[in-house]
Swiss-Prot record:
Keyword Transit peptide belongs to the record: yes
Residues reported to bind heme b: H101
Protein name: Succinate dehydrogenase [ubiquinone] cytochrome b small subunit B, mitochondrial
A family per Pfam: CybS
Function statement: Membrane-anchoring subunit of succinate dehydrogenase (SDH) that is involved in complex II of the mitochondrial electron transport chain and is responsible for transferring electrons from succinate to ubiquinone (coenzyme Q). SDH also oxidizes malate to the non-canonical enol form of oxaloacetate, enol-oxaloacetate. Enol-oxaloacetate, which is a potent inhibitor of the succinate dehydrogenase activity, is further isomerized into keto-oxaloacetate.
Domain of life: Eukaryota
Transmembrane segments: 63-84, 90-110, 120-141
Transit peptide: 1-29
Residues on Mitochondrial intermembrane side: 85-89, 142-158
Name of the encoding gene: sdhdb
Pathway assigned to this chain's UniProt record: Carbohydrate metabolism; tricarboxylic acid cycle
Organism lineage: Eukaryota, Metazoa, Chordata, Craniata, Vertebrata
Stretches assigned to the Mitochondrial matrix side: 30-62, 111-119
Record note on quaternary structure: Component of complex II composed of four subunits: the flavoprotein (FP) SDHA, iron-sulfur protein (IP) SDHB, and a cytochrome b560 composed of SDHC and SDHD.
CDD domains hit by this protein: SQR_TypeC_CybS
């Protein structure tokens, strides 16, 4: 049976503690079952789809994940459309898509890094305020100024 040996077990630097003795640092690469003669490699299961994470069986998480992916693809397709055909409809579509994309992304940051009921409620309220102000600002910019498409074109032209 093959074995994986750490480098620290090969280098002896004087006295080593009990937990770091060479005999405790040798770990088997393959695990052998007592009932069978064949050995099985240790493997990790990698989940690539959101359906493996939906523990309650509801479709809300899957639909949300699908919506995020559709929005990401829509943003990818809006970039060339905004460059070749700038119009108010594309400006407002970009404003809505960018705001929603940012809202969902920052919502995941809040979910991952904010702990405690009161802190989560405050962070979500702040996120809603930020998303609302962002969308209102982009709509104001589209209505009273040149719009998102022409503004980016002006940045590239200078």
């Amino acid at each position: 049976m093959a074995a994986l040996v750490r480098i620290s077990s090969l280098c002896h630097r004087g006295v080593s503690p009990l937990l770091f003795r060479p005999s405790s640092l040798i770990r088997p690469l393959a695990v052998q079952q007592k009932d069978h003669d064949c050995s099985y490699l240790i493997s990790a299961r990698i989940h690539a789809t959101p359906s493996n994470y939906a523990g309650s069986g509801s479709k809300a998480a899957t639909m949300h994940w699908t919506g995020e992916r559709i929005l990401s693809i829509a943003l990818l397709s809006l970039a060339p459309v905004a460059y070749f055909c700038p119009s108010p409809a594309v400006d407002y579509s970009l404003a809505a898509a960018l705001t929603l994309h940012g809202h969902w992304g920052l919502g995941q940051v809040v979910t991952d890094y904010v702990h405690g009921d009161a802190k989560i409620k405050m962070a979500n309220a702040g996120l809603f305020v930020l998303s609302t102000v962002t969308f209102a600002g982009l709509c104001y910019f589209n209505y009273h100024d040149v719009g998102i498409c022409k503004a980016v074109a002006l940045l590239w032209s200078k």
